[in-house]
Structure formats: structure tokens, C-alpha cells
């Protein structure tokens, strides 16, 4: 499935989506296992930004704080182990947005993780604190060898 990045998405103009529009800073990422255990995949605290645009586009970048530089100093080259570590501590993707009630659907058009391109990433959204806090919860999926539910808490910054 190829989702174009031009034109307005189905979410554009929706009153709930209008409350999401802006830039958000990641303050917490909980990965909750089926046994109730909680891990923090990108450390505690993680680093991340999420932006929703008025036309229904989203983009996010999430990483572990304090990631080491790749010694080669070259954007596309470097030792394989360092590149693997960099890949394993960063997530980035862009999508068109659709809504089903307060479930936000990211129709992924590009991603650092190529398996997500063309996928629909569903996030159950809850706004609180006068729309200054956003909690996005994903349906369970496998990560680091276990089924887990991802719950990301964001703070509005712009």
C-alpha cells in the first residue's frame, strides 16, 4: 500500500484531530509485557518529538538519550556494530493520519524500520491536562522477543 504525502488526509478538519495538531515532546515510554512488567525501551527518560500538521501529516523521531557518535564521522558509513547500535536506539517514521473515534491511525509512508512502510499503526489517544498531555497506546506487538503494549506519554511544546 502506498499512501501519498500530498493533499489533505481524512483526519484534517476533525475536531479531535485539531486538538492533536502541534509539536509534542516525549516524556515517558512504557513497554508493558503480558505479565505486567514494565520496561523503558529508549531509557528513562527517552528523547523524542512528535508533530501533527493541520493537513493530517505526522512525523516522529524517538531515541535513547546520550547515543554515542559513530567513530567514522560519515553520515552513511561506519563500523557495522556502531551502525547496528544506532539503528537499535532510534525510531523515525512519517505518515498520513486517519481517525476512528479517538484512535489515531498512522498510515506509514516512510520509516527507519522498513517493515512499517505501508502499514497502519494504530494508537489509542487520550488527551488530558487541558490538552497539554497526550498518551498514545499501541495494540500489543512483538518487541525485543516479547509481546508488549507500548504506552508513550507526550507533552505539548508547540
Predicted features and spans:
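Lipid interaction determinants
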Residues: 1-94, 99-158
